[in-house]
């Protein structure tokens, strides 16, 4: 009996130490997760959307250039980018398949717009992961997958344009006025349209104005040290550049 018990103890100890390296090896596999990143961003077909008074709607397209589907949520905000605007986008939520393009429609929900000048809103498109987008673990290697989903929210300008406005961007650019105010220069917009300015150059200086635009009948004050001659890069409705020297 003594010999039998001694044999059993030795056998148990032998199998215990044989198992330890295996357990340690499995632990190392679990401690090294696979990191998978997915970016839920979309390509928008324009930099701004123009809604003309009395039109039933306007539209724009979006494209999913990723290799996986993306859920899309849309919302229109007022100029403050927080309160809801009198527009809806249809469909407000949709699934865009991989490498697919679709068109969204913007519809007004009110007619209480300023009839004398343009109004600015923000059209925001957010890409989010589908609810069932869960990666399964590799059970054979006992490997843990760490999925990181990067959600993006792209906002572009939505401009309401009354019927009374018929000036082209070139005509608006010709109407801008420059006035010196102390040691700085003020750019005045005497029109009822928004003026989108991508860049300003003066001598060796190059800079932008706050928000990138001048509102109707508004102005932008340039920093001190700017020369009397400046060059503006103005964007039209399609995002094309118009260069003007003043």
UniProtKB/Swiss-Prot annotation:
Disulfide bonds join 124-155. It holds the Pfam family PapD_N. The keyword Aminoacyl-tRNA synthetase does not apply. GO terms for cellular component: outer membrane-bounded periplasmic space. PROSITE patterns: PILI_CHAPERONE. Keywords: Chaperone, Disulfide bond, Fimbrium biogenesis, Immunoglobulin domain, Periplasm, Signal. Residues 1-24 form the signal peptide. This is Chaperone protein SefB. It comes from Salmonella enteritidis.
